[in-house]
């Protein structure tokens, strides 16, 4: 999956916006911030947007 940067928003497709749901898991050493892509990103919640590695799938083909 390729990523495209439009302004401050990184999308998986040049015509789409992808947002993530935030999940914070606290492990003994340090908190780990996890996020997964979801479609239907609106202008009002676009502050939660995928980073490039999230768009790229991060481990899945």
UniProtKB/Swiss-Prot annotation:
Gene3D superfamilies: CD59
Keyword Secreted in record: yes
Compartments where located: Secreted
Keywords in alphabetical order: Disulfide bond, Secreted, Toxin
Alphabetical list of SUPFAM superfamilies matching this protein: Snake toxin-like (SSF57302)
Pfam families: Toxin_cobra-type
Entry's Gene Ontology cellular component terms: extracellular region
Keyword Secreted attached: yes
Tissue distribution: Expressed by the venom gland.
Biological role: Shows no cytotoxicity and does not inhibit the binding of alpha-bungarotoxin to nicotinic acetylcholine receptors of muscle and alpha-7/CHRNA7 types. However, it potentiates the binding of alpha-bungarotoxin to the acetylcholine-binding protein from Lymnaea stagnalis.
Family: Belongs to the three-finger toxin family. Short-chain subfamily.
Additional information: Is classified as a P-type cytotoxin, since a proline residue stands at position 28 (Pro-31 in standard classification).
Full protein name: Nakoroxin
Organism lineage string: Eukaryota, Metazoa, Chordata, Craniata, Vertebrata
């Amino acid at each position: 999956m390729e990523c495209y940067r439009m302004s401050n928003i990184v999308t998986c497709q040049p015509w789409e916006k992808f947002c993530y749901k935030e999940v914070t898991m606290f492990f003994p050493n340090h908190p780990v911030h996890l996020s997964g892509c979801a479609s239907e990103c609106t202008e009002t919640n676009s502050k939660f947007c995928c980073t490039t590695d999230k768009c790229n799938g991060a481990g899945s083909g």
